[in-house]
UniProtKB/Swiss-Prot annotation:
InterPro entries in the record: Acyl_CoA_acyltransferase (IPR016181), Bact_Acetyltransf (IPR050832), GNAT_dom (IPR000182), Mycothiol_AcTrfase (IPR017813)
Lineage: Bacteria, Bacillati, Actinomycetota, Actinomycetes, Frankiales
Gene3D superfamilies: 3.40.630.30
Gene for this chain: mshD
The species this protein was found in: Parafrankia sp. (strain EAN1pec)
Name of the protein this chain belongs to: Mycothiol acetyltransferase
Ranges in a coiled coil: none
NCBIfam families, sorted: mycothiol_MshD
Subunit field text: Monomer.
Amino acid sequence: MTSLSWLRALDVADIAAITDLLAAAERADGNGGVSEDVRLTLRPGPVGGGVEHLVARAGSAVVGYAALGGTATERQAELVVHPDHRRRGVGTALVHALFATTSPVSLNIWAHGDTPAAAALATRNGFDRERVLLQLRRPLASVRPGDPDDLPRPIIPADVTIRAFEVGVDEEAWLAVNAEAFADHPEQGRWTLDDLRAREGEPWFDPAGFFLAERNGALLGFHWTKVHPQDPVPEHPAATDQPAGQPGPIGEVYVVGVASAAAGTGLGAALTIVGLRHLRDIGLASVMLYVDEDNARAVRLYTRLGFRRHAADVSYRRPARG
């Protein structure tokens, strides 16, 4: 018998059980099960950060988990079921509990991995496929045979300087440019100082890999890189033409943004190359990034820089019900 409960506060045991579930799903599926945003809310104490936590238990064991966030008019969720308890109605039970909480507003559910099982669950419950987030990759050695270094040198305008982010100094300027650059992005453009501070407190945060482009002291753009100690998605779907990832660290183009004053100048491409060269120079063999499938301009840029599809996450949407 599966029981469902909303957690109004998280204790160490809750977090350990959810983390163990996510680890089991990652081993089975080759992906993390939920996003970084959700993982950052798994902290002891009263539930906060705009995220609610739902667990499914079989006896005392946590066999399913859902995180619910979003806005008052557009809710967003992520859910995962333990590999040993799939095809037993746990996923459907979680979805129905989300319906009960979110109705009548619309609900988006992210599936990490573009799988037939996720698509079937979505279709059975009235969801439409709405958004695809691609994971692209490339090696940091040459991707062209015979070319020992196919990362071009970045072309930086003479009046633009590149420097590293300074904690305690650059947060407000960065948030302003980030909001401008991602004004139409459903997640990135809504970052707050708390969101930024949370990343600054993570073990992976390294300001030396967080590049800012300035003109006369004004921030024009940025490239924030990240290093994963272990590849978060080492296996790839058979439908892609990319080799499987390798155990060990991998770099990430975490986020690249350009202010409207510098749009169309090539600064975004230059900053991307600056970050790729940094990741290569610190000894990483490959790099990944996430980009919306319908962001044709960005996909073209990354394709020109040697990136290829490795995996995909899919958002399914159930419209508001009157």
